[in-house]
Amino acid sequence: MRLQVKSRGLELSSELRSYAESKLGRLDKQLADETAVEVELAEETKGGRFTAEANVFAKGQTLRATESTSDLRASIDRLVDNLERQIVGYREKRRLERRRRTEHHGV
């Protein structure tokens, strides 16, 4: 998995970057090596809310998640949970498609 973390409207400290990278590292087991993950962390100008957005460019599919809370770390945590659910669904869908093709050719 190739991971890119960037920020918009806030200073991205090395501590915050490493926190995001370690949390998103949980996805590495579920994704292929060639999968690219882009994450943008932002502070909204009004309301003091923090947003974490991610795009996962998997084979044949782009998964996208956005989470916004008053705490940036909580936004990152919720973002990773959201992505994990999407990746499980994506992998299950691909597994069923392969099974369907195999059954079709085997008949």
Residue ranges: model-predicted function:
Residues 1-107:
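N-terminal, polar/charged subdomain of small-to-medium soluble alpha/beta proteins
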